[in-house]
A protein has these predicted regions:
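Generic hydrophobic alpha-helical segments
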Residues: 22, 170-171, 197
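Glycine-centered short loops/turns at secondary-structure junctions
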Residues: 29, 56, 204-205
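C-terminal substrate-binding/catalytic lobe of Rossmann-fold NAD(P)-dependent oxidoreductases
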Residues: 121-171
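A contiguous active-site-proximal alpha/beta segment in oxidoreductase catalytic domains
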Residues: 32-33, 38-97
Length: 210
């Protein structure tokens, strides 16, 4: 770490390891990126960020989908509701839907309810300002698509742009400026939503508080 200008912490399919893996990097004072999924739950996310904040280490985490060009055309202040769908396996792939959804809704989720079969799930999300959104996953795969209802109409977006390239540009910019493009509190809220979503999938048809 001493010879590094910036650090990347990778454990993409085992986010429960991030808290342990982040202890030294996030105490180093050097800019750090933690790969998605940031943490398994809200409490762990808060603990990880607390280490960085105590040492003054710039850090952030995101799904690369946040950088898709398609989302840039949407004015978050006009969003009324969102339907999002993508691949199945909530534990691994849901972050790629939750991240852009939270970026566009710009409100704190209050509670969630799930329905599911062996091949599909639907997660309904109610936000504290009364708006709602949904996330669906499909066993045999799906492109990342959103139907966004706004005050001016409805827009269907399918992600086809080179979002990973745009993400890398954002990552390089972060290492240069040490300014995180995603606030810690937003990432914590996304982890809280993911945690509640996982609980909701175990009790279909029941509301679970975030």
């Amino acid at each position: 770490m001493k010879k590094s200008d910036g650090l990347i912490i990778l454990s993409p399919d085992n986010c429960e390891l991030h808290e342990q893996l982040c202890r030294l990097p996030l105490s180093s004072g050097k800019p750090c990126y933690v790969d998605k999924t940031f943490a398994p739950d809200e409490a762990s996310a808060k603990r990880v960020f607390a280490v960085a904040e105590a040492s003054g280490t710039p850090c952030w985490s995101t799904s690369a989908l946040r950088f898709a060009e398609e989302y840039a055309q949407i004015d978050p202040s006009k969003v009324v509701a969102i339907n999002s769908w993508g691949p199945n396996d909530f534990e691994i792939y849901a972050i790629h839907q939750l991240e852009p959804l939270m970026m566009l809704m710009q409100s704190r989720p209050q509670r969630v309810m799930a329905l599911k079969t062996d091949a599909w799930y639907l997660l309904t999300i109610e936000f504290e300002d009364g708006r709602c959104a949904s996330v669906s996953g499909y066993e045999h795969g799906s492109p990342f698509v959103m139907n966004i209802n706004s005050k001016t109409g409805s827009t269907v977006l399918e992600v086809k742009s080179d979002f990973f390239h745009r993400f890398i540009l954002g990552l390089v910019q972060f290492f240069r400026t040490k300014r995180a493009p995603v606030p810690h509190e937003e990432t914590v809220a996304i982890m809280a939503l993911r945690e509640a979503g996982q609980k909701a999938l175990t009790v279909p048809g029941q509301w679970v508080n975030v």
